[in-house]
């Protein structure tokens, strides 16, 4: 049975990475073994009824949550990285961040045609990263069956960009 108020393990950092943005820092949650374990267990419970083959997650904090969930659920893990970080041939997507533009790269053979994918990340803010991840999965012939996030910034209305997708979040601001 779950017992922790996980929101109390999220630290607010005002004006980071730039003025006017409140950064939701999950490192206190990751540092606390009980909170981290409960967060992973609860995120896995959010998607227990979904059928998928792989967990796809972006660096850096997405790796932490995605790899832990893949291990617990007995699934493969696919890392998505920034430019120049993956050693094999990649495909990429550009996207808008809350505070700029970025690219996400994935190995061209990371997902087989028809494989079902769960996308995992730490924070759902504007939905831009999630959209780019969806495009990458589709580009390789995969099917996104669900997206799971530790934190959602609902005041930024990210779900508008993800209409038609099964979106699960644990902590909502």
From Swiss-Prot:
The gene is apt. One of its GO terms (molecular function) is adenine phosphoribosyltransferase activity. Pfam families: Pribosyltran. Its main location: cytoplasm. Belongs to the purine/pyrimidine phosphoribosyltransferase family. One of its GO terms (cellular component) is cytoplasm. Homodimer. It comes from Thermotoga maritima (strain ATCC 43589 / DSM 3109 / JCM 10099 / NBRC 100826 / MSB8). The lineage of its organism: Bacteria, Thermotogati, Thermotogota, Thermotogae, Thermotogales. The keyword Cell membrane does not apply. Keywords: Cytoplasm, Glycosyltransferase, Purine salvage, Transferase. Pathway: Purine metabolism; AMP biosynthesis via salvage pathway; AMP from adenine: step 1/1. GO terms for biological process: adenine salvage; AMP salvage; purine ribonucleoside salvage. Its EC number is 2.4.2.7. This is Adenine phosphoribosyltransferase. The keyword Cytoplasm applies. Coiled coil: none annotated. It comes from the Bacteria. It catalyses: AMP + diphosphate = 5-phospho-alpha-D-ribose 1-diphosphate + adenine. HAMAP family: Aden_phosphoribosyltr (MF_00004). It is found in: Cytoplasm. Catalyzes a salvage reaction resulting in the formation of AMP, that is energically less costly than de novo synthesis.
């Amino acid at each position: 049975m779950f017992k922790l108020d996980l929101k109390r393990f999220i630290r607010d950092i005002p004006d980071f990475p730039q003025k006017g943005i409140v950064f939701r820092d999950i490192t206190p949650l990751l540092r606390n073994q009980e909170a981290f374990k409960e967060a992973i267990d609860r995120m896995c419970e959010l998607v227990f009824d979904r059928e998928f083959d792989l967990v796809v997650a972006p660096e850096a904090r997405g790796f932490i949550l995605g790899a832990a969930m893949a291990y617990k659920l007995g699934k493969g893990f696919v890392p998505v990285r920034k430019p120049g970080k993956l050693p094999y041939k990649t495909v990429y997507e550009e996207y808008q961040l809350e505070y700029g533009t970025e690219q996400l790269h994935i190995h061209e053979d990371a997902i087989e045609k028809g494989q079902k994918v769960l996308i995992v990340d730490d924070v759902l803010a504007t939905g831009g990263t999630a959209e780019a991840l969806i495009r990458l999965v589709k580009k390789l012939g995969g099917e996104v069956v669900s997206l799971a996030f530790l934190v959602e910034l609902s005041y930024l209305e990210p779900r508008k960009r993800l209409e038609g997708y099964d979106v699960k979040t644990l902590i909502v601001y």
